[in-house]
Amino acid sequence: MSGWARALLLAAVLVVMACLVPAATASLHAEETLTSQFAEFKQKHGRVYESAAEEAFRLSVFRENLFLARLHAAANPHATFGVTPFSDLTREEFRSRYHNGAAHFAAAQERARVPVKVEVVGAPAAVDWRARGAVTAVKDQGQCGSCWAFSAIGNVECQWFLAGHPLTNLSEQMLVSCDKTDSGCSGGLMNNAFEWIVQENNGAVYTEDSYPYASGEGISPPCTTSGHTVGATITGHVELPQDEAQIAAWLAVNGPVAVAVDASSWMTYTGGVMTSCVSEQLDHGVLLVGYNDSAAVPYWIIKNSWTTQWGEEGYIRIAKGSNQCLVKEEASSAVVGGPGPTPEPTTTTTTSAPGPSPSYFVQMSCTDAACIVGCENVTLPTGQCLLTTSGVSAIVTCGAETLTEEVFLTSTHCSGPSVRSSVPLNKCNRLLRGSVEFFCGSSSSGRLADVDRQRRHQPYHSRHRRL
């Protein structure tokens, strides 16, 4: 080989080495960063593995999940993804422990739905029930597929508070251990839970203090029926329309809503608004606590049950209006029991035309299924601005066949955005426990001459929010 050829070969080798050294250095740096992140993860979440082989496997899973986080970040420019408490779990492990309700929710999709009627007149631009003190702290379902119980109980906690009672932490363990309609740590349905509470537990929901959660390791202890304190009662539940605008309008007036979602893309979520959520099958139960339509990207606010170390202090935001994560498919809420607070006297002016004989409406609630036994009536005027116990206002009017309630979402003087709903008159409506019937009439003496079944006057309980 000539001298110039040897020189050229040497130069080529040097060039190749010059290229390889930075690449090797970068690779080494990336590996060191990964090792450092993994060590920080283990310390933060108390991970101790049984063997060196197990630790090596978990490190490889950790690496794969960081790559998955980058993929989700690329698809969701308004959200962030990274290391979470689940970063050393395979996707199958994560699914089986934290969002394993696919079979239950698939079965629910086959049943006939009877949603409440919600008319969207003009919901407020933003609602956050956390700011109104209606939501308990984020909880931890642990390695148990009990999301359905946390969703249902979270809803009851909020509804109980908004009916005028103290905010009370209630027991998920009661459902996980005792509700045999559902499957404990293997999944369940919020609607089943509501029905079990009413039909099998006399509507009673125990306090968390008297029946604490004990299934965090994936094992459900046997049901116990004594020694527990009743913290709330429910009388039934309602299903909401599969429409995000109507769900928002209902939530704005009535409070947080239990919903099912597809949570398969949530494992690496750390913050922001998800705009490209996997939306293939329902597999997880959560709680809608608010929304914001005035944001650059309108979003839902969702309370999860994966501790405050996940997401935004235990919450996630997803884009609103495009059925992200299938959020509109299974929405429901408990109907709470108890008397609720007595409404404050209203001094607002009537919105109806003046006249000597004001109109009234009667809500007759009975303990049987035929509106005959144990009936008690509530009588209030129609056409007047009534102050509600949730701090807003409403006007009730009577039509030929229906009673219509218009709730004003941001005003105590019956002005601004409102939501309107209707119920049939003179028809007994069967509930899960008991029944209810509405009547309308008028009398100058202040009693309804055309309703002869009135027993006594009590505060009216609105279908939207108790007045």
Swiss-Prot record:
Residues annotated as region Disordered?
Answer: 333-355
Query: What are the recorded Gene Ontology BP terms?
Result: proteolysis
A Gene Ontology molecular-function term? cysteine-type endopeptidase activity
Keyword Ion transport attached: no
**Record keywords, A-Z:** Autocatalytic cleavage, Disulfide bond, Glycoprotein, Hydrolase, Protease, Signal, Thiol protease, Zymogen
List where Low complexity composition bias occurs.
Answer: 345-354
Would you say which domain of life the source belongs to?
Eukaryota
Activity modulation: Strongly inhibited by E-64 (L-trans-epoxysuccinylleucylamido(4-guanidino)butane), Leupeptin, and N-alpha-p-tosyl-L-lysine chloromethyl ketone.
Q: Which residues are glycosylated?
A: N169, N292, N377
Q: Provide the disulphide bond pattern.
A: C144-C185, C178-C223, C277-C325
Q: Where is the active site?
A: C147, H284, N304
What are the residue positions of the site described as Cleavage? G337, G338
Propeptide positions: the record gives 19-122
- Effect seen on changing H457Y: In clone 1800-2
Show the catalytic activity.
Broad endopeptidase specificity similar to that of cathepsin L
**Result when mutating V286L:** In strain: RA
Q: Determine if Glycoprotein is one of this entry's keywords.
A: yes
Instruction: Relay the record's extra comment.
Output: Purified cruzipain is able to degrade itself, yielding a complex mixture of small peptides, and a major 25 kDa fragment.
Function summary:
Hydrolyzes chromogenic peptides at the carboxyl Arg or Lys; requires at least one more amino acid, preferably Arg, Phe, Val or Leu, between the terminal Arg or Lys and the amino-blocking group.
Question: What protein name applies here?
Answer: Cruzipain
- Write down the species: Trypanosoma cruzi
